[in-house]
A protein has these predicted regions:
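Phosphate-group recognition and catalysis centered on beta-loop-alpha active-site segments
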Residues: 2-327
């Protein structure tokens, strides 16, 4: 019998090649997973290190400035995802705690699942829940999302449930529309249209709808000019500037501006208010930022993960202003 060219060694090499490729692919997958978990760990560590101590928060309980006392009304305290300093963010427990603690405003992150259900969930929280980076709410069905643990046994709530339960108990409820889902809702309905339907279905007359996407906000305005909307002003990256999010004179008819704290200043607020708009500063999670938005750039509302100390600080400052006037 004639021996095949190359013999047994060639045969073994031919059989080994697919196995080596499979091992390389598995190795790449394991490496990618490790990198992703490492990124999540670093993000969690950075977030932990950013949490101010009780001693640091004491720095916001300072005598009010003339700028603060010149306010015509106290600023709204908008609990970012509820009282997310003490409860898992964007959960029913966090929103209930914020309302019970006196917050007069809630900021709610709303995204669409793959099968078109609106839920209250931020992409950042989802990545931590599934321990994977790069995923979006639109990658999952509502059934899959509803089975996830949002923290401490809490579940991801439907947006409808949150608005129905809590909008009657606050002055303002902000729906922050998230549009980063791949395949969420699908054409032709946009997230803006879905959020508008949500506000109408829940009779949320005190809802403000805003998003980083001007296109979505314009779509809402075209569907219902009477709906309160806002747009985001930020200048953190070249992409923000490329997409025009650093511009103040956008979206005629939008009465609310969600302004990143780094952009906020007395002169900028004066320019924005000249057009009759309200300004909400975000996200005030350090004593320095809180003092800036209270004393230097007096915004109309402050979005924060720490509503409790902020509420106390505002109360003390308002009393001090009143006492100063009486004297």
């Amino acid at each position: 019998m004639q021996r095949a060219a190359g013999g047994l060694p060639a045969l073994f090499k031919a059989r080994e090649a697919p196995a080596r490729a499979a091992r390389r692919q598995r190795g790449t997958g394991v490496w990618a997973a490790a990198v992703g978990l490492g990124a999540l760990f670093c993000a969690a560590l950075v977030q932990y290190l950013r949490v101010p101590s009780e001693g640091q928060w004491a720095g916001i309980f300072t005598p009010p400035t003339e700028i603060f006392c010149a306010r015509r009304s106290r600023p709204l305290v908008c609990a970012h995802g509820g009282d997310s300093a003490h409860y898992p963010p964007n959960t029913m427990a966090a929103f209930a705690a914020a309302v019970a603690g006196g917050s007069d405003c809630l900021e709610v992150d709303v995204a669409g699942t793959r099968d078109g259900v609106l839920v209250v969930l931020h992409r950042r929280e989802l990545e931590q829940m599934v321990r994977r980076v790069g995923v979006t709410v639109g990658d999952f069905t509502f059934r899959e999302i509803s089975q996830m643990d949002a923290g401490n046994g809490q579940r991801v709530p439907r947006a409808e449930h949150v608005l129905r339960k809590f909008s009657p108990h606050v002055e303002t409820l902000i729906v922050d529309i998230k549009v980063d889902g791949r395949g969420a809702l699908g054409a032709p309905k946009s997230m803006g249209a879905a959020a508008l339907e949500l506000a109408g279905a829940t009779d949320c007359t005190n809802c403000i709808l805003w998003a980083k996407s001007d296109e979505e906000v314009r779509h809402i305005q075209s569907l219902d000019p009477s709906q309160a909307v806002g747009f985001v002003v930020m200048n953190e990256s070249s992409l923000d500037r490329l997409e025009g999010r650093d511009k103040l004179d956008r979206l005629a008819g939008a009465a609310n501006v969600a302004m990143h704290h780094e952009v906020a200043s007395g002169s900028v607020l004066e320019e924005v208010r000249a057009s009759g708009r309200r300004v909400f500063g975000w996200t005030a999670n350090t004593p320095y930022i809180v003092r800036k938005l209270l004393d230097e750039a007096p915004v109309d509302g402050i979005v924060t993960n720490y509503p409790r100390p902020l509420l106390r600080a505002i109360d003390e400052r308002m009393r001090a202003c009143l006492s100063e006037r009486e004297n």
